[in-house]
């Protein structure tokens, strides 16, 4: 069992929150270009696609829109996803402390449950943040509907209210719960295995490069489990509103994807996600663990 660190002026939850924000900001800066490619591939038509594959997508975006296009809509996720990741880690660490309150080690199923709870808590914020980001990412050319994240929020909320902003929430919640359950389970299993194998008494003794590898592995575990939900979410969040919507609900969307493209349709755009998963999640956990160690005695 890892030693209990006495709290200083800051509560443990506050420390988890600050470390999570740091990890989230790092994740956005590294992962945003990959996410842009993923969304373009996911949201394009199955009948007449604009991009043949991920590399073709990168080439066409670079040529037609410039390199800055890969960071479209970054301001909101930089703030929003940073906050989202802090919610993930704060909730997860709180659940870990709850499950180990009587001194017993946290079990693997409890790690999954803790991750799933953190995903549900996070989904209320990440849903609208990603909705706005996606609306901005799919805009091409000069005649755009939304001029930045705040303009996007204003226009959607004024026309369609809160339900418009929260469009695609159900598949987002499913993705976050199952995905983060697997995410934290994989990471903690790798850390625990290393600590036991090398007789480490504290996770701060784990080398930084291993934290990066474990973070990358956790990212793969999450996306392998959650990607089909993400496909449905992206389809709905790039769909029209109310009477202009192609899909009435998530189930109809999933059936439509399967009818047109089979199981392969649920993994469209998966290559840039796999490429992104390693660096984005490696840096997330490395920054989170590093900041946690630096502020643990505050």
Curated annotation (Swiss-Prot):
InterPro entries: Mit_carrier, Mitochondrial_Carrier, Mitochondrial_sb/sol_carrier, Mt_carrier_dom_sf. One of its GO terms (biological process) is glycine import into mitochondrion. Coiled coil: none annotated. Pfam families: Mito_carr (PF00153). Solcar repeats lie at residues 14-98, 106-193, 206-294. Keywords: Membrane, Mitochondrion, Mitochondrion inner membrane, Repeat, Transmembrane, Transmembrane helix, Transport. Gene3D superfamilies: Mitochondrial carrier domain. GO terms for cellular component: mitochondrial inner membrane; mitochondrion. The keyword DNA damage does not apply. GO terms for molecular function: glycine transmembrane transporter activity; L-glutamate transmembrane transporter activity. The chain crosses the membrane at residues 17-37, 67-87, 112-132, 172-192, 212-232, 266-287. Its main location: mitochondrion. It is found in: Mitochondrion inner membrane. It is a multi-pass membrane protein. Acts as a glutamate and glycine mitochondrial transmembrane transporter. Belongs to the mitochondrial carrier (TC 2.A.29) family. This is Glutamate/glycine mitochondrial carrier ymc1. The lineage of its organism: Eukaryota, Fungi, Dikarya, Ascomycota, Taphrinomycotina.
